[in-house]
Amino acid sequence: MKTDIEIAQAAEIQPITKIAEKIGLSFDDIELYGKYKAKIPLEVLEKFDEQNDGKLVLVTSINPTPAGEGKSTVTVGLADAFARQDKNVMVALREPSLGPVMGIKGGAAGGGFAQVLPMEDINLHFTGDIHAITTANNAISAFLDNSLHQGNPLNIDPRRIIWKRVLDLNDRALRHVTIGLGGPLNGVPREDGFDITVASEIMAVLCLATSISDLKERLARIVIAQNYDRKPVSVGDLGVQGAIAMLLKDALKPNLVQTIEGTPALIHGGPFANIAHGCNSVLATKTALKLADIVITEAGFGADLGGEKFLDIKTRQLGKQPDAVVIVATLRALKMHGGVDKKELTSENVEAVKKGFANLERHIKNMQSYGLPVIVAINQFASDTESEISTLKELTEALGVSVSLTQVFAKGGEGGLDLAEKLSAMLQAKPDFRYLYELNQPLSVKLDKVVTEIYGGSKVNLSPKAKRQMREIEENGWNNLPVCMAKTQYSFSDQANLLAAPEGFEVTVRELIPKIGAGFIVALLGDVMTMPGLPKNPAALKMDVTDDGKISGLF
């Protein structure tokens, strides 16, 4: 079979004006970025404001293997399947971060015959949104250090600055740096560090903002440091929220592209799900809901991370909950949770599937606890056997949950027709949605509910630092914000090697970081890196561009 990039380059891509017409947008409703990409101005959302919202389908997954389980691929293929059934459908996805693309993933725009196009552009610089976020983030750092240099009128304690610079690359050497060296003319010496851009609070702010005015208000609330009295210092205290919003003016607009089969796709924003909330922008999802009858969207990593955050964080800003949830499962991941070594995942092992099913079962019950109908999509791989597939189907159906075998990687929309048909029936009913916790509950209760009811743990322990931070959060009146758990994606717990569905474990919250602009409190569990490193053999080693500009090596 051809590689992803070979399939993408051989596909017949339509002018973006044609794609816009499919969802009722005229030439004047879009801003062109070349022939195959466009931005949708915020006024368009206002224009369709009276339109009823379409149905919203959330695609999530079980705890993945390091290779991922094809959640984006299933999301794209499902949208194409609905389009084949003449449904007015759109897909809404996050945009890839360049760091992981050049590090491990090699690309993140779907796979096989279920991709979004232009694949090379989307995986690289796209419309420049992430670069704008990088600039906005680092501008705040520059203004902060200038304030220190110019007499420190805000009385900022340089030892208590929490705002870091960012870069959209995996670069472990920049995690901890010292700046301001070289004498008085070069600023105030202090410790600093770099995060990857998609871990920046600016990314989360952009993805949760609903307008330019909301963007400015959120930017102003971002806490960047403490002063010598241990009081918070914000971007608003620097007085630069207007300038930062100006830098993000165009990045706030959703990006319109297409799938291989010509289904309209909005790709906008890309916060990590193991660090931030892991969902595409509220504005993109809102826009899609006004323009389409069915919207397929995804949340990063498993249902314990991106799925939980979509439901407890994003829906509160979106003003709408999903009408159904698709949980993507693969037999290789279930076998991994069943104790099979990563090198043996392609060998048949029915007993391991049965043992690893505990992971999928917990995810199913978790999503059902929100009052949402659930269907399992088996993302089929060539190594899957009939015995393994039938075993997984039997186990899933025994829970009263529908299951569909999908082959969208190999067949595109055709391989998702069964999933689309089963979902169509599920979408007729209105779910009785309920949140995991209420915002007015104490932060300790919210943490406990996520850990005990979603993860299956028994207790939350706070480090001395986290205890102090919780007191500060309460003193500052930030207790009514949702929690955003930052942990490993491979396990329900905070330990990557605790697979399947562990019980009775305790988790330790190392830090509680207030992200007041985004509107949530990040709880750091375990050893989560906000600036990844490159592997021994980065995916970039296989990437190249020919003399005529043709790209190779993305996958």
Curated annotation (Swiss-Prot):
Keywords in alphabetical order: ATP-binding, Ligase, Nucleotide-binding, One-carbon metabolism
EC category name: ligase
Pathway: One-carbon metabolism; tetrahydrofolate interconversion
Catalytic activity: (6S)-5,6,7,8-tetrahydrofolate + formate + ATP = (6R)-10-formyltetrahydrofolate + ADP + phosphate
Enzyme Commission code(s) on record: 6.3.4.3
BP-aspect Gene Ontology terms: tetrahydrofolate interconversion
GO molecular function: ATP binding; formate-tetrahydrofolate ligase activity
Binding-site residues for ATP, renumbered to this chain: 65-72
Keyword Nucleotide-binding appears in the UniProt entry: yes
HAMAP family assigned to the protein according to its UniProt record, in alphabetical order: FTHFS
Entries under NCBIfam families matching the protein: PRK13505.1
Protein name: Formate--tetrahydrofolate ligase
Organism whose genome encodes this protein: Lactococcus lactis subsp. cremoris (strain MG1363)
Gene name per UniProt: fhs
